[in-house]
């Protein structure tokens, strides 16, 4: 078996010809190796988009607010994200819910769960049903229909925790 010398035609890779797509591929690879400063110059800023009247999607809004806070510009974007202060007057379940930390009636929020929201009963999580996991009756005895009461959901409606119980195919909700 003969060895080929280093740098011969057999060991060198042949350049591929991609045709018309070669230019696009070269542009994409050069963009990947660009410095972040060049990318920042090419991409429009969230503040310039806000001044131009271009609406930002809600997913991008929190990044735009963080960026504009760092630059201390873009008051229009900051005003969109500010929440109105919660009323301090007592009375009514809606005011109580706002003061306790429930965001909106019956809505789950994306904010991290705080202890005040947990104390208000606004967990917005449906507990796991024992009937979905499978029967726990290992002795094969039929379970009476009256005992099949499960806690279906705990909702935060206007600040009051609402418990819904499912029994005999009907849903009963109590405060």
Curated annotation (Swiss-Prot):
Q: Which domain of life is it from?
A: Eukaryota
- Region (Disordered) location: 1-39, 70-100
Q: Name one GO cellular component term.
A: fibrillar center
Q: What is this protein called?
A: FOXL2 neighbor protein
Organism field: Homo sapiens (Human)
